[in-house]
């Protein structure tokens, strides 16, 4: 699991990476032997790395085009960091081209539906490479927040100041899962006219079935990887969140 979900930072060299649309300072990591995949190293608050890691992996397990993602073992005093596969993007195709290209139409709709299911309320960042659309940036999804993780990190201290019930509420606030399917429908069908109502409905039903088909063993692998660097309560939070998505997908 360590090799699969973690980047060995000592094997890479780093340079400052400047781009638009991603928050905070980032670095581009390349293998020191000048080969293999390059990664964008991203950190922006406690919840950024875990949301990117979980969002990208869950999307990939649903068959959505996304970059690979790895966690990085923190050095002493470091922030949480996620390494996201660098994909050099060409100019995005215009909506007219997407509407009339079956492959691009499907990729566009499924990319946005992944953000919908994971309740990522930020703008959907898209990349276009080798004739395919990819999505990224799930940092605002999954109902995870910086404050809750901070409380998890300091639960022993806060546990002496507040009741265990209050501590649990701060660490694991109730998840009110309500994906904005209507907003995505209006955008894709009514506003942008990317697809028909029938296409949207079929795609939503299909991506829900894909989510339900994700094996419990894969979910456990992802959560176990998180607990290598995050407090164990965070895995509990994601477990609750994933179960909420499953409930929605069964309806």
Predicted regions and their residues:
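Alpha-helical context
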Residues: 35, 99-104, 180-183
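Short, low-complexity, polar/charged sequence segments that are solvent-exposed and flexible
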Residues: 58-62, 101-105, 153-157
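Conserved ATP-binding subdomain of kinase catalytic cores across diverse folds
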Residues: 2-93, 114-121
């Amino acid at each position: 699991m360590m090799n699969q979900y973690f980047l060995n930072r000592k094997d890479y060299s780093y340079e400052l990476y400047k781009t638009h649309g991603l928050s905070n300072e980032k670095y581009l990591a390349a293998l020191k032997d000048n080969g293999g995949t390059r990664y964008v190293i991203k950190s922006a608050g406690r919840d950024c790395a875990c949301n990117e890691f979980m969002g990208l992996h869950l999307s990939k397990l649903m068959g959505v085009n996304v970059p690979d993602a790895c966690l990085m073992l923190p050095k002493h005093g470091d922030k949480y960091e996620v390494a996201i596969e660098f994909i050099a993007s060409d100019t995005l195709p215009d909506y007219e081209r997407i509407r009339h290209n079956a492959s691009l139409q499907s990729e566009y709709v499924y990319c946005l539906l992944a953000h919908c299911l994971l309740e990522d309320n930020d703008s959907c960042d898209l990349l276009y490479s080798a004739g395919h659309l990819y999505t990224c940036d799930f940092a605002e999804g999954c109902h995870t927040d910086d404050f809750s993780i901070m409380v998890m990190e300091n639960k022993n201290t806060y546990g002496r100041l507040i009741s265990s019930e209050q501590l649990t509420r701060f660490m694991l606030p109730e998840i009110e899962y309500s994906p904005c399917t209507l907003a995505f429908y209006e955008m894709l069908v009514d506003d942008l006219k990317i697809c028909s109502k029938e296409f949207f409905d079929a795609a939503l039903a299909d991506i829900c079935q894909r989510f339900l088909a994700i094996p419990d063993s894969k979910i456990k692998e992802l959560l176990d990887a998180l607990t290598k660097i995050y407090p164990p309560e965070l895995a509990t939070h994601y477990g609750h969140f994933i179960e909420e998505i499953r409930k929605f997908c069964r309806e």
